[in-house]
Amino acid sequence: MKTPAHGTAVGGARRQAAACALACAALALPSAAHAQFAGTLGIDSVDRYRGSGTAAAGPVARASAMVDGPLGTYGGVSGLWRTRDGGFASADALVGWSGRLDALPGLGALSPDWGWDAAVHRNYYGPGEGHDFSEGMLGLLAPGWALRSWFSPHYFGGDMHAFYTELNASQALDDRWHAFGHLGWLHYGHNPSYETPIADRTDTLAGIGVTLSNWDLHLARDGLVAGHVRGDHDSQRRGPAWILGASVAF
């Protein structure tokens, strides 16, 4: 997210990066790309995280807010609720800092639309769940796409660290329609509790969306194309899924 003085494509790419980190609708916030504050309310047919389902079975509702600060700083919070019983599912918080690559020494010849991004992200699943974790991120931003890598020393609250690298892209088809895609790779670090290393995972997502005023409607398909989810997850959470959703920005 950028302040008004830096309203280039990097600002939109950074906002998209933060929105994805907070698990908002893929590359959403189309009507708020240059605001200092942006919020969304949305609903999705299913909650997915890095290519697999979560414990929040059924449709989920989400409320998110992002804010730009001075000198390229930004932050955001998001909450997720199950629609089947209205119960709390999870929450996220993100603080970050970003800027233009051409402002760095020796990189002045680069396009001002290219940028860098760094952030810290916290996932919270409620008291007593034991799955809360934090991760740090470094990213490269460009018009239409963002590449970033995340590192968590205690992935999902466990003793194992993990790296996750993702490429997110979006392409406008006309004034209303846009296509978006995602490719992610998860690598687990060594854990002496496991006799054999956990295999890497690769997930993908592809979808299409339409913007109607400040509403965004989207349909996507995601799943794993390599590796597998833990065996204690049921088949519905392990398999691919269609995601139908809507969000409104304000």
Language-model segment annotations:
Residues M1-A38, G106-L107, F250:
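Cleavable N-terminal export/targeting peptides
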Residues F37-G39, L71-G75, D102-G108, P112-A118, ...:
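Repeated loop/turn-to-beta-strand initiation elements of outer-membrane beta-barrel proteins
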